[in-house]
Amino acid sequence: MAASWSPLVTLRSAARSRLTGRGVGCGARVVAIPPPAPGPGKPLWKAYTVQTSEGVRPTAASEARLKALAVCHGPLDHYDFLIKSQELREDEHQRRVVQCLQKLQEDLKGYSIEEGGLFSKLFSRNKPPKGLYVYGDVGTGKTMVMDMFYAYVETKRKKRVHFHGFMLDVHRRIHHLKQSLPKRKAGFMAKSYDPIAPIAEEISQETSLLCFDEFQVTDIADAMILKQLFENLFKNGVVVVATSNRPPEDLYKNGLQRANFVPFIAVLKEYCDTLQLDSGVDYRKRELAPAGKLYYLTSEADVEAVVDKLFDELAQKQNDLTSPRILKVQGRELRLNKACGSVADCTFEELCERPLGASDYLELSKNFDTVIIRNIPQFSLAKRTQARRFITLIDNFYDFKVRIICSASAPISSLFLHQHQDSESDQSRILMDDLGLSQDSAGLSMFTGEEEIFAFQRTISRLTEMQTEQYWIEGDRSRK
């Protein structure tokens, strides 16, 4: 199977063609070529690969970054080039991580998983190098260094996916595999069947290198299978590189039945070296020119009329009529009430009050370069589900450089309201009852929204960057 598509890899190839006068023509505008859509029967997780590979980094790049992709030969070379070009400033924490990624990139040259069974893999001379787990606060450059690594790594089969999307597909694969088993006859007990090993084998046949963005565990269904799944992947020879906001020891912290999850941490650390990237600087919040006012408070006078006017101005540049839009998402219909060309005008209720997920937001990101989001509420723990959807929405929009105009009930920095609860909510009690857990065994801090708060720090950082002129220009697909 061919390596997954990535814009940075595409830009690298196109940039070299641009400088040499081959391929796209000397001086030609470099454009990101869209990947083929996943066809019928292809695993869903390949769609998530497209999601993250397609939108992982800017769809527009500065001349210095294009030149770096054309002339550099590895992540460290690329990093040094951007320092000299004053595109980046020296950061010893970033450099240390890039140096480790450079070594791994060199170790992976020509690496592939041996064909055959587990026995042949165990005794293969082509031993896999250890992967890397890079963690640190939001905005410290984890995604950027992953971009550099992924653009230059030379292995036949590599994939870059959001961890959440990857696990969604694993569960779908498990479901499909179980559905394909012969039905048991009446009166006979069905034999227990463990689908994890064959699923891991299937994934191992598709890729030798798995790169994960946003490695975080919040779902008990994920937590219970991670050890077995990754143990099989590692034994099959899959190399893992991951970025996360948390050190391995803090994954699924205070989660339900965490004792069953803890062994996974040892497996992860056995096969991946752990690196901290935490310079104490959120580069997304650095001083950048604003793109004009893009974030409005609903308490401001005539805010609806102002946002209406902004939509009208954007719509006038589209060769289309304003009307409802229906998108097809995995056989379902996603209806939007108001859109014009590549501009959508949505309410928070449309996007986050309905049962939508990552695949829906992926489709939005592919179809629109500008989205208005009206009436975003201030999030409390009572709106936990909506907060999770909003986080996923912004993650997708950020990955695809989708430009946003917002009206909200609170400033970005105050959008998430952390509340201390003296007693567990009705929803928490119901969940505990369903799992047969007492208050003591459940660890009530699981229900304090700790994971959501952590993820929201990333969202606030991204929302801040999305207000800048640089981001707005990079997201203009009409320029490409």
From Swiss-Prot:
Coiled coil: none annotated. GO terms for cellular component: mitochondrial membrane; mitochondrion. Gene3D superfamilies: P-loop containing nucleotide triphosphate hydrolases (3.40.50.300). ATP binds at G136, D137, V138, G139, T140, G141, K142, T143, L209, L210, C211, F212, D213, E214. Its main location: mitochondrion. Its EC number is 3.6.-.-. Highly expressed in heart, kidney, and lactating breast. Present at reduced levels in virgin, pregnant, and involuting breast. GO terms for molecular function: ATP binding; ATP hydrolysis activity. It comes from the Eukaryota. One of its GO terms (biological process) is mitochondrial protein catabolic process. It is found in: Mitochondrion membrane. Disulfide bonds: none annotated. PANTHER family: AFG1-LIKE ATPASE, ATPASE N2B. Putative mitochondrial ATPase. Plays a role in mitochondrial morphology and mitochondrial protein metabolism. Promotes degradation of excess nuclear-encoded complex IV subunits (COX4I1, COX5A and COX6A1) and normal activity of complexes III and IV of the respiratory chain. Mediates mitochondrial translocation of TP53 and its transcription-independent apoptosis in response to genotoxic stress. NCBIfam families: ZapE. Belongs to the AFG1 ATPase family. This is AFG1-like ATPase. It comes from Mus musculus.
